[in-house]
Each structure stands twice: as structure tokens, then as C-alpha cells.
Amino acid sequence: LEEWLRVMKISKSYGMNHYRYHTCCPPESAFIAADMLGIYMEPQLPFWGTITEEGEENHNQEEQDFLVEEGFNMLKFFGNHPSYCMMSMGNELWGSKKILNDIIGGYKKFDNRHLYTQGSNNFQWFPNVIENDDFFVGVRLANDRLIRGSYAMCDAPLGHIQTDKPAANHDYDSIIRPQKQANSTEVSEDGTVQIQYGTTMKTVKASEADADFIPEVPIVTHEIGQYETYPNFKEIEKYTGSLKARNFEIFRERLEEKGLLPLAEDYFKCSGKLAVQCYKEEMEAVFRSRLLGGFQILDIQDFSGQGTALVGVLNAFMDSKGLITDSEWREFCNDAVVMARFDSYVIEAGSSFKAHAELCNYRPELKGGKLICTLALESGEVIGKVEKDFVSEGNYTDICDAEFTFPQVEKNTKAVLSLEIEGTDIHNHYDLWAIPTVEKTDISGAYIFDEVNDEAESLLKQGKTVLIVPNLSRLENSIEGFYCQDFWCYHMFCIISQMMKKPDP
């Protein structure tokens, strides 16, 4: 019990109030700890595969009966715990919707106190809601109706954090209730589709997706985040038991062979800072969305398997990696989050900066308050302040607009936009950058080429101005620029993409 309390107290200090157990059910001590701390628990049946009907290929009735009985045992032994709130039939399942619906129906007849779902991200590109679903968990509502910020390349299209310029303006409401039809996912002529399955891929049967699919039950976004950081080699010494950090040792050896080991600490800190920025935007996109019922971050701690997925702000021991404190994390992950909505973190000096302040609030006692919004340079110089009294409107409140004019600066200068609800612990901040006024370069007399050729070289020898804008498709060894960390584990998903004959990450 003490260890479960330790782990869950740490998670709760980071604003987490919910645990989903990937294809497993924890022991009773976990439920006791969750009861004591106020954590919502969602155990899953121990299954990640295809639910078949009798007579179908690979049908195993004995296995299916075992799974169903496991579910009844979970309800019998743990169902009375107040924390046992939800239950899932497994992870990323395929197969018979009828059997899944019947299984849930049996559990509801036995114990209807819980909320049930057919699974987490079932049918992947072909999402659906069955009759007995109490809520929906997934990553998309159609091929291009995405409800999380990042994806593996084998699950493309990629998310907004991977493809868009950094901003604080994304939400999923127009995706959940779209104004126009989305693109549906196509299946092959034999009615199959290739999917990622653990660390590999498999082929499953699928029917055409409904591009207009709109769940009429609460929507939970599945396994969000997954932003990887560089290894912290100082963690190697923490492995004092039977397990050793051989993966970290290999990574360190590779870095040393390249003569880059002195940069290891910088790589760790810089990649971690970027990962935290990605997580902040990921979480705030959820909290900005009025039509989302919740989220399940894949993990707040590192995962040592699947090729090494260092996606946590905590390491595998649940210790802080020093990238962000729990109080800083709670600015954008809590039962009340005040946010600013704006289009760019970079503002030209002398220009106007506009932001919209809003509050996502699940505190019944918070009926209203006063917003204080301040923009200041890193030096402490206050550019402007806006104060606004408001009345809380349910779970989501549009508070006000704020507009500031940035002063002239001679060099790139950091500014901080701060928001707080006066007299509470609800506050948030955004690091902005003011850049000097950009003078446009006159290139009217320049000769522009997309490659270095004889004509370009001849013009250069004549003293002419030549600008080379390369064709990116010809730069075989280049890395596409984007402001985001790798997803989960580069090596694992690179292999899966190659198996599925899709582009490398």
C-alpha cells in the first residue's frame, strides 16, 4: 500500500486525478490508495487483439471465456471500491462489435455502477460507438479529424503540434462537431488495413469509416503526449538492483564515439525543455476544448521498454528529471486552468499582441473572481496589465480579450504573459519573444536558382547576386524542420513504418 500511495501522491501533485491501466488490473492495494487519494481508476481486460465470433478465423472460445471471466472477477473483488469508476474491454481492439457489446452488457447486468467502454482506441482509423458504450476513447474521429497533438508516422496524418508553427490557439471542438465532411479512411480491395500492433504491425479486417462520425457519449482522448527527451546519463547510477540501465550505457558509448559526450547534459536539458513546451500545448488544447470529456496522457514517467521511450517529466523511478516542477506543471494540468489563446509566441517590436483569456473550471466552489493579466519584459518592465471581474459559466468561461503593444527592442528579448485568478492558486504563464523590427531585404536584383548549376556559377564569377533556394525533395540527407520532439521511440516506429511501407518518421 505504501508504494501505491507514494506513486499516486506524486501523480496527484502533477494534477493527475485518473489512472487507466493498459491491458491489466492493478491489485487491491492500488484501489485502496486511490480511494484514499481521490483517484478515478479504469482497469482494462488483459487483451490487445481481435475479438472474434464463433466460426471466424483464429477464434478461440476458451481464451474469450477466460477474458470475460477475468472481467467478472475484477468486478467481484474490486468493484466495491469507490475509485473503481470505469472499465475498458482492452487496448486497441478489433473484431466483432456485437461480441464486445454483449460482453459489456453482461457486466452492466452484473454491476451497473461503473462506466464502461468497448476499449481504448478500438478500430483506430474506423472509430465507432456501440450501444453499451458509456464513453468513447480514441485518437481520431475520422482519418483527418484528429483529437490529439502528436502521432507516429505509421498513424499519419500527424498532429498539430508536429505540423503547425508554435501557438496557443488549438482546440478540438470544430473537429468533434465539424462543419464539413472529413476524409474517410480507405480499406484495401480485400477489406483489410495494416495497423501498428505493439512493436510490430498486423493486418486486420475493417469496414469503411464513417467520416461524419460524432459520438453522443463523452469523448476521452487516448495516450496523448509521448514527447521524448534525451537520456540523462546520471540516472545510470540509480540502477542498484538486479536491473541495469544497459540501454543508457549503449547510448552513452555511441555519443562518446562521436566525441559528443561533453554535450550530453545540454542535449538532455534542451530536449527536455522542448518536450515540456509540447506537453503544455498538448494539455491546453484539451482544456480549451469544451466538447472533450477528458484525456489520458500516455505517461508522466519514462517507459524503459519498446526501444526506450523517455517520454516522462519523471524518470522510471517517478523522480523528477528537473525539467519542470509539479507546481509549474499544474499551471496547465489541474482541476482549474486559466489560459491565454494567441497565434504566435514571436512578436515584432512595435506591433500589437492580442490574446483571449479563458478558464476551464471543475471546482464547484469557484463561482467567479478577478482575472489579472500582465505582460512584462524579462527585465521587469511592465508593458501592460488587464484586470477583469467574471462570473464562472459552468466548466468553461470566456473571460476577456487583452491587447498590448510591444515596445521597440534592439535584440531578441524575452517577455512573459502572466495570468492569475486573484486570491487563488490558479495561474499560468507564457514565454514570448519580442524581435527587432525586421527590415525587408531587396532581392529585386538577385538571380534565384533551386540548385547550383553552370549558369549560377557563371553569374557569381561576374559578381552578380545569386540566391540558392534548394528544392527540398532533392536534399536526401536533410531533416525536415519542425518544432516538436520525437514521438515515443524513433527506432521502434521507424521499423513499423518501413514494415507498413510508409514514410520514415
Which residues are covered by each model-predicted region?
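Non-catalytic positions within long, well-ordered alpha-helices that form the structural scaffold/packing
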Residues: 9-12, 35, 287-288, 460
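N-terminal carbohydrate-binding accessory modules
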Residues: 1-11, 32, 211, 432
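Carbohydrate-binding surfaces of carbohydrate-active enzymes
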Residues: 224-227, 236-505
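Aromatic- and glycine-enriched glycan-recognition loops and surfaces
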Residues: 2-26, 448-449
